[in-house]
Amino acid sequence: MDIIRALLDGIAMAAIFNGSAAALVIANPRYLMDSYPKGIQKAAPEPMSKKEKRVNKIFTVIVMGGCWLYGVISTLHGGIHTFKTIFCTAYIHWIIVNFADFFLLDCLLFQKWTKLIVIPGTEDNPIYQTKNWMKVIGIPEHFLLWPFITVPLFSLVQTGIVMLIQLLFLPLR
C-alpha cells in the first residue's frame, strides 16, 4: 500500500466533497438544512421544500458518487489487490474527508463565517455558537459516528466495488 498516494487521494476527495458542500451551503443554506443540528432545523420557519430536498439528493448522489468513483479508480490504478490493503486505503481516503469536513466546514466555515451559512429565520439560535455547535454536531459526528460507523461502512463499500471490478475485469495476478 502506498500511504502517500492514499493520503493525497484522500485530500483530493476531501477537496471535491468540502468544496462542493461549501459552495452549495453558501449559495443557499437551506439546500443542506438536513445536515444542520435538529434544533436549527426545528427553529427554521418552514421545513425543506420538495425542491430543496431534490437539490440535496442530486448533490449527494453526484458529489458522493464522484468521491467514490475517484477512490475506486485511484485504488484500481494503484494496483492494490488484497482486501486488507484496499480497505485500509479506502479508510484513509474517507477519514481524511471526515476530518477535512470537521476542520473546513464545521470549524472554519460554520464558526468563522457563520453569516454565510445561517438559515433565514434561525439567526439568533444559540446552536450556532462554537461550543454548542461542537457539542451538538461537530464532535459527535466527526469523532464518533464517522470514524467508527460511516468511514468503515464507506470503506467496505469501496473495497467491495474495487474487488468486484478486479474479479470481473482484470486478469488474475
Regions found by a protein language model. Name each.
Residues 13-21, 63, 67, 97, ...:
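Alpha-helical transmembrane segments of multipass membrane proteins
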Residues 29, 33, 130-153:
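Individual transmembrane alpha-helices with interfacial aromatic-anchor signatures
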Residues 43-63:
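Interfacial helix-start motif at the membrane-water boundary
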Residues 106-126:
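Juxtamembrane non-transmembrane "cap" segments at the membrane-aqueous interface
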Residues 157-173:
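Juxtamembrane boundary at the C-terminal end of a transmembrane helix
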